[in-house]
C-alpha cells in the first residue's frame, strides 16, 4: 500500500511499536521503493516492549547485521525524535543512536509523545512534514 501513491514525497511517520514494525518491514523486503523520509517518534526499548502483555518472541536486536543496511536501503533520510523521560525507553535513546548511527532529536520531558503525556496537535510535526527541518520537531 505504501508503494501505491505516485507523485510527491513518500514519507513514513512511525510511533513506538510502529518504529519497530517499519524496521521489520524494511528487513523483510516489504517496500518496493525507498521512502524519501522516515520519522521514528518515541521508539521503544525492545527489551521493555517484550515485557508488555501480548508481545511474544525474542526482542528485536537493534545491532543485528541486517538492521542498518535495511534502513539505509529503504529510506533516503531517517529522523528520530525521543524524550529524556520515556517510560518505554528506560535505557535511553542512545541504544538507537548507536545501533542506527543516527543522532536523535531529544525533546525534554515529552514522555512517550502520547495523549496520556499531554500531547495533542503538534505543530512541529506538521512543519517537519512541510519543510524537512528536524529542529522544527522541538516545537509543540
Positions of PLM-derived features:
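Active-site nucleophile elbow and catalytic-triad environment of alpha/beta-hydrolase enzymes
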Residues: 52-70
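Catalytic histidine-centered segment of alpha/beta-hydrolase-like enzymes
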Residues: 110-121
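Short beta-strand/loop motif that positions the catalytic acidic residue
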Residues: 74, 79-82
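Active-site nucleophile loop of the alpha/beta-hydrolase fold
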Residues: 38-48
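Conserved alpha/beta-hydrolase "acid-adjacent" motif
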Residues: 86-92
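Conserved acidic catalytic loop of the alpha/beta-hydrolase fold
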Residues: 1-10
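Gly/Ala-rich beta-loop-alpha elbow adjacent to hydrolase catalytic centers
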Residues: 13-23
